[in-house]
UniProtKB/Swiss-Prot annotation:
This is High osmolarity signaling protein sho1. Keywords: Cell membrane, Membrane, SH3 domain, Stress response, Transmembrane, Transmembrane helix. Residues 57-67, 115-126 are extracellular. It is found in: Cell membrane. Plasma membrane osmosensor that activates the high osmolarity glycerol (HOG) MAPK signaling pathway in response to high osmolarity.
Length: 311
């Protein structure tokens, strides 16, 4: 029988969403300090109350009330509670795709409720249909907001009024986050590469080295390689003798970026920096996977681009 040992961390792909593994804390100030969140949630609650009370009155006084509309009332309540949690925990950028999916289903349900109620003769059913119409309008606004990237101009304009969110300097000139996985600045290390025996690899060894990954297989924990991983090393990193030096620190940081997740620097790599969620960093170059950044306290280093959003 094959004995399974504890999986090595080098065999697992690191997740860029470490922040999402911890339950986000609900803060009422995220809603009270955001006019968009406060207004849309308040209007949706008002719309739901109108639809709910009118549905009760219509079901009591009139015959043939469409039972399907009760599912629309229940689903609308779930949407309101879910959106309140999203705004309160400020996790819209994390669950944006799921939010749009649930809102799209709610749009269909409320629209069917409008079609089955607004054309009835009794005033209570018409009032319930009006509540569903108002709820549908709020859902359309939410879909347009969460269905857009954080770099969208209209979303930056809306977020600029919130007290708990950073205000982009020029929301009309928002730039999308770079998806080009270019060269990471190379670092030097005096440590020898870690070697594994056949027993430690436990069947994962190969007869030839992995092509295209000098210095080890992809996912290796040793991130301080003396050989370039992608392409040729920059001439700025080479001395006259051909030896590789530390990455020179830039003097200008023309870009500003906001951290959408917290990041803890690798203790084995002195060139990385740690930062917290919503922290603003100054960035010198945005062309690669790792950006040279500077914090407000003057600390400089490299930061993963998928943790940052350009302002």
């Amino acid at each position: 029988m094959v004995a399974y040992s504890t999986p090595s961390s080098s065999l697992h792909k690191p997740s860029p969403y470490n922040e999402s593994r911890r339950m986000a804390r609900f803060r009422p100030s995220n809603i009270l300090g955001d006019p968009f969140a406060l207004a849309t949630i308040s209007i949706s609650i008002l719309a739901w109350v109108i639809a709910f009370i009118s549905s009760i009155v219509s079901a009591i006084n009139a015959r043939g009330y469409p039972t399907y509309s009760w599912w629309g009332v229940a689903y609308s309540l779930c949407i309101i509670l879910g959106m309140t949690a999203v705004f309160g925990t400020d996790t819209g950028s994390v669950y944006g795709v799921a939010i749009v999916g649930y809102l799209s289903a709610g749009m269909v349900i409320t629209t069917l409720g409008v079609n089955s109620l607004v054309y009835r003769s009794d005033s209570a059913s018409q009032a319930a249909g009006a509540g569903f119409i108002l709820m549908s309008m709020v859902i359309v606004i939410w879909i347009f907001y969460f269905g857009s990237t954080p770099q969208a101009s209209h979303r930056g304009f809306i977020d600029s009024f919130a007290l708990q969110k950073e205000h982009p300097g020029a929301y009309g000139n928002g730039r999308p986050m770079s998806t080009a996985f270019g060269n990471r600045p190379e670092t030097t290390s005096s440590q020898a590469p870690q070697m594994y025996t056949s027993a430690q690899l436990n069947g994962f060894e190969t007869s030839s080295p992995v092509s295209g990954y000098p210095g080890g297989a992809p996912g290796s924990e040793n991130r301080s390689s003396s050989q370039p991983r992608f392409g040729n090393p920059s001439n700025a990193n080479l001395t006259a003798n051909g030896n590789e030096n530390e990455v020179p620190q830039p003097t200008e940081y023309p870009y500003r970026a906001k951290a959408i997740y917290s990041y803890d620097a690798n203790p084995e790599d002195a060139n990385e920096i740690s930062f917290t969620k919503h922290e603003i960093l100054e960035v010198s170059d945005v062309s690669g996977r790792w950006w040279q950044a500077r914090k407000s306290n003057g600390d400089t280093g490299i930061a993963p681009s998928n943790y940052l959003i350009l302002l």
